[in-house]
Amino acid sequence: FWLEHDLSGIPEDSLKNIGCLQESQVLTSVPTDVFNAFSTFVTLLEDAKVIRGVAPVFAPDLLDVYAELAAKGIQIELVVTREVLENMLELADRSPLKDQLKANLRLFVIEQNPKTVFTVTDYFFMVGLFRLDGSYDYSDQLLSYSTEGTGWGRELFDHYLGASEEFDLRY
């Protein structure tokens, strides 16, 4: 997994502690289920109490998932690139759950491309990376349920949160 991906989005301090992810599993999409990793991710989100993520890529279907979770009172914090923010805002304006999104979603904008896509919750950490050719790898994701793995993910999130600025959703 690691050798096939661009690790430049992971800070050096985090790379030194990558052993915290040793109990992880790789979720791979297969020809009979090309959305295996994404489907698993959405299912896992449904049981989360807190969701924090970094997203330099955009999956429109995910905004509906976040809106439904926000409507249930789940607190969501996302660090996104400006391009992803613009796409999210355009779709959010059309969402019937727009008010719930505003109440329970905090968006932070980062100017640099993090080159890593991940979510950390109260019970799992899931990360996707870009391939060495620069394209995002939608088919392989690394998933950890361990305390060490989620702790590693929280530290990575804090790194990117510190490099971002909050966007005011009260538009």
Regions found by a protein language model. Give the residues of each.
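Residues in well-ordered beta-strands of folded domains
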Residues: 27, 79, 108
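Interdomain hinge/linker segments and adjacent boundary elements that couple functional modules
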Residues: 1-60
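A structural signal for well-ordered alpha-helical scaffolds and beta->alpha junctions
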Residues: 34, 38, 90, 146, ...
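HKD (HxKxxxxD) catalytic microenvironment of the phospholipase D
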Residues: 106-150, 157
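HKD-type phospholipase D/PLD-like phosphodiesterase module
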Residues: 82-123
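Residues that form generic nucleotide/phosphate-binding pockets
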Residues: 44, 100, 156-160
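Cysteine/selenocysteine-centered motifs that mediate thiol-based redox chemistry or coordinate metal-sulfur cofactors
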Residues: 155-171
